[in-house]
């Protein structure tokens, strides 16, 4: 049986690979992509997600989520991912559009309506998931696990201690980490070693 996942991201080159891999893995049922600000503004990360979904020929919804973190101001990472958040490739003109639901509504509806538990994979700040949990805590009963790219068991990449995705919205991370959901963390100690051939 395919594993049902929702991919919550802020594309970004790293998240582009996540979309490519999740969207083409025969063992995964990618229900949809929810987008937050992070690597760039929400307008740019959302457009990047749409471009990737169209380019890869995926038939899944892309839902815009939180424009800002729960408390602090948005901080982007244009020094790494460029002005567009996905510099280095020119996509053809967009012919698809966003799903009308917000990321939070999509997360809630998908999880509550599923007969099987859903895995939520976050590769950016966890704002959308945290807000969905606060909006409807019942979703916690039907989440298999949260798999996140974030945090670190050693040093940070934004400050000596802080990793970017957690740094962007620490309050969202706090909500997710303190929920009843099983958490699998893929931190900097892992992501710094990944080789893509």
Predicted regions and their residues:
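N-terminal acidic, glycine/proline-rich low-complexity segments
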Residues: 1-197
């Amino acid at each position: 049986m395919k594993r049902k996942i929702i991919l919550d991201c802020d594309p970004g080159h790293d998240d582009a690979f996540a979309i490519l891999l999740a969207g083409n893995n025969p063992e995964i049922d990618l229900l949809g992509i929810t987008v937050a600000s992070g690597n760039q503004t929400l307008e740019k990360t959302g457009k990047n997600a749409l471009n990737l979904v169209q380019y890869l020929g995926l038939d899944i919804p892309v839902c815009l989520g939180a424009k800002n973190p729960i408390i602090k101001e948005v901080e982007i990472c244009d020094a790494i991912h460029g002005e567009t958040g996905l510099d280095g490739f020119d996509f053809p003109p967009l012919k698809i559009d966003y799903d009308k639901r917000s990321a939070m509504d999509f997360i809630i509806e998908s999880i509550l309506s599923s007969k099987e538990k859903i895995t939520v994979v976050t590769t950016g700040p966890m704002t959308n998931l945290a807000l969905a949990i606060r909006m409807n805590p019942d979703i916690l009963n039907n989440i298999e696990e949260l798999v996140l790219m974030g945090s670190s068991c050693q040093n940070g990449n934004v400050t000596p201690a802080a990793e970017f995705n957690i740094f962007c919205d620490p309050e969202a991370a706090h909500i997710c980490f303190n929920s009843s959901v099983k958490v699998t963390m893929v931190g900097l100690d892992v992501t710094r070693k990944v080789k893509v051939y």
